[in-house]
């Protein structure tokens, strides 16, 4: 459960990211594919080469979903219900992949915003991404 301090840290960080969320989402997704090659299996129809427009576009979708989540921190399950259905029933993404992408998102954000990436912010973002991952995998059961 996100504490009030966590929610403040997440919202504040997301505000600082601003218009770069899509760019960072693409970078994090590319980092995930490079660092964890098994994640590529869900994207056989994508050009997965560095700088791929398809990877950038999907990264923007990831960032848009996270932006939606940031706007609904008190109702993540409701806000992400359709995405949870999609990933559980249609795409059948292995839940571990959400953890891998979350890690790569943290690395990407730390690279771009080192001064703001304090231990408290790191912990809050980690809890946020973990909570989002839990919501996205909740319909697997």
Curated annotation (Swiss-Prot):
Pfam families assigned: Globin
PTM annotation (Phosphoserine): residues: 3, 35, 49, 102, 124, 138
Sequence positions bearing N6-succinyllysine: 7, 11, 16, 40
N6-acetyllysine: residues bearing it: 16
Positions of modified residues (Phosphothreonine): 8, 108, 134, 137
PROSITE patterns membership: GLOBIN (PS01033)
A GO molecular function held by the record: iron ion binding
Entry binding sites for O2: 58
Keyword Transport annotated: yes
Residues annotated for heme b binding in this entry: 87
GO CC terms of this entry: blood microparticle; haptoglobin-hemoglobin complex; hemoglobin complex
SUPFAM superfamilies, sorted: Globin-like
UniProt cross-references to InterPro entries, sorted A to Z: Globin (IPR000971), Globin-like_sf (IPR009050), Globin/Proto (IPR012292), Hemoglobin_a-typ (IPR002338), Hemoglobin_oxygen_transport (IPR050056), Hemoglobin_pi (IPR002339)
Domain Globin: residue ranges: 1-141
Swiss-Prot/TrEMBL keywords: Acetylation, Heme, Iron, Metal-binding, Oxygen transport, Phosphoprotein, Transport
Tissue: Red blood cells.
Modification Phosphotyrosine occurs at: 24
Biological-process GO terms, alphabetical: hydrogen peroxide catabolic process
SUBUNIT field: Heterotetramer of two alpha chains and two beta chains.
The family this protein is said to belong to: Belongs to the globin family.
Role summary: Involved in oxygen transport from the lung to the various peripheral tissues.
Protein name: Hemoglobin subunit alpha
Source species of the chain: Martes foina (Beech marten)
């Amino acid at each position: 459960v996100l504490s009030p301090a966590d929610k403040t840290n997440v919202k504040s960080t997301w505000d600082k990211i601003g218009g770069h969320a899509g760019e960072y989402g693409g970078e994090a997704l590319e980092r995930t594919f490079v660092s964890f090659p098994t994640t590529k299996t869900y994207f056989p129809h994508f050009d997965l080469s560095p700088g791929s427009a398809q990877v950038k576009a999907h990264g923007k979708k990831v960032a848009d979903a996270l932006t939606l989540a940031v706007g609904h921190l008190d109702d993540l399950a409701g806000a992400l219900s359709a995405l949870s259905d999609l990933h559980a029933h249609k795409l059948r993404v292995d839940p571990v992949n959400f953890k891998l992408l979350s890690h790569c998102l943290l690395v990407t954000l730390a690279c771009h915003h080192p001064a703001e990436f304090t231990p408290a912010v790191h912990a809050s973002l980690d809890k946020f991404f973990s909570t989002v991952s839990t919501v996205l995998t909740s319909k697997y059961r």
